[in-house]
Design a protein with these regions (language model features):
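Feature responds to low-complexity, polar/acidic, surface-exposed segments characteristic
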Residues: 2-40, 52-102, 109-130, 136-177
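Conserved dinucleotide-binding and phosphotransfer motif residues
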Residues: 49
């Protein structure tokens, strides 16, 4: 039952995160948001529980911006309550900045994300909907083995995400989130 509650909580939170990744949002306290956005409540909840905190010290959220792979690792580490402090000073990839390294390392250890090859994570790259969806679905227990993907992980991810309604109300394409 505990795992079911965790999965449902993760699914609901992830749906809110994915909606914001793609469509933007607004929340009280941010300088660059307006209350007319459909994602206001989701942003306020994620802000209140410490999962998302905005993009700078000036009080901006950047609702029309996109997330990088590094930033998504931070979101997932907070969402899953991973012990990222354990990974401070650990950097398994040559292209991950120090601020993101413990979050990326925790997500890699949990099996939520992986590098792009040759010792690189691609953390400064804009995360795609398929990549974000895969991280969420791995956290939910999907795609634990390589053979789960078939010949194309992106197609498998989008197909399964659609099947479980992960992308409901998310306006996206396979290129960017």
């Amino acid at each position: 039952m505990r795992n079911l509650k965790r999965a449902l909580s993760l699914l609901l939170s992830s749906t809110m995160v994915l909606g914001m990744v793609v469509m933007g949002g607004s929340a009280a306290g941010y300088q660059d948001v307006d209350a007319s956005n459909d994602n206001q409540e989701a942003i306020e909840v994620l802000q209140a529980v410490g999962i998302m905190s905005g993009v700078d010290d000036a009080g901006n959220f950047n609702p029309d911006g996109s997330l990088t792979r590094n930033e998504m690792a931070v979101v997932m580490a907070h969402l899953l309550n991973l012990d990222y402090d354990y990974y401070r000073g650990v950097n398994t990839f040559t292209d991950v900045p120090d601020w993101a390294a413990p979050y990326v390392a925790a997500c890699v250890a949990e099996g939520v994300t992986a590098g792009i090859g040759n010792g690189l994570y691609g953390g400064d790259q804009q995360i795609t909907a398929a990549q974000a969806g895969l991280m969420v679905m791995k956290a939910l227990g999907y795609f634990q083995n390589q053979e789960d993907f078939g010949s194309d992980w992106q197609v498998a991810t989008i197909r399964q995400a659609s099947y479980i309604n992960l992308f409901d109300k998310v306006n996206s394409n396979a290129e960017s989130a």
